Amino acid sequence: MVMAATRGEVAWPTIADRVRLAGGVMSQREGHAVAANFGSAATELAICVKRVGLAVRSDLDALEIAGAEPWLAHFLEESLGGRAPAAGEAVRTARSWCCRVAPDRAVVIGPWSAAARWAGIVRHAVLTGAAIDFIDRSDSATALTLVGPRAARLLDDAGLEPDLPVGGVRESWFAGSSALVLREAADRFLLVLDAEYAVDAWQELLDVGRVLGLSMVGAEALERLAAAPGRIF
């Protein structure tokens, strides 16, 4: 087993190790290993529809963009076609979410290729004089999806307040890590945590969610769910 994450002198399993040990059948998405399923995509889809599923989103990358409020607002307006999200809001664009977590900070979460495009846009803006900067969070952040009719209750039980509107985002604290919480849909949440504490967060969600029927789900179940009538992802 690869023990890539370390705290002091002690080596800890990574979230990828835990996914494999949990039975994840791995496949490639944009050159990155992703859990396609945990035995049956059909069963996992039913879990997402009837209970609550937890997915480790190694198919997603994160990019943090920072700058004084006027500069960041102008950059986001230009990049998003006219309206920058207010603090606490997220905008869905080109398979990604642009989350304004503070007046001077935004986090973009999306597929690796989309995050790379955003990084290119930021670099171009900096070269043309914009007073903004970015941090590539590909090695320091982990994204988790909770989806299903019991997802909000699970977050509430875990101490992560789920009372956000769809498209609402807030920063919180969970399992020793700062945590971005985004409500993607009425029954779907995206969490972005420090990678160093991703295993702790994953385990805590599993422990809290056991009484709610929480199970691991893979990318195939999420893709099937997105293809259902009335769903956008």
Where are these regions (language model features)?
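Basic, glycine/lysine-rich polyanion-binding surfaces/domains
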Residues: 1-233
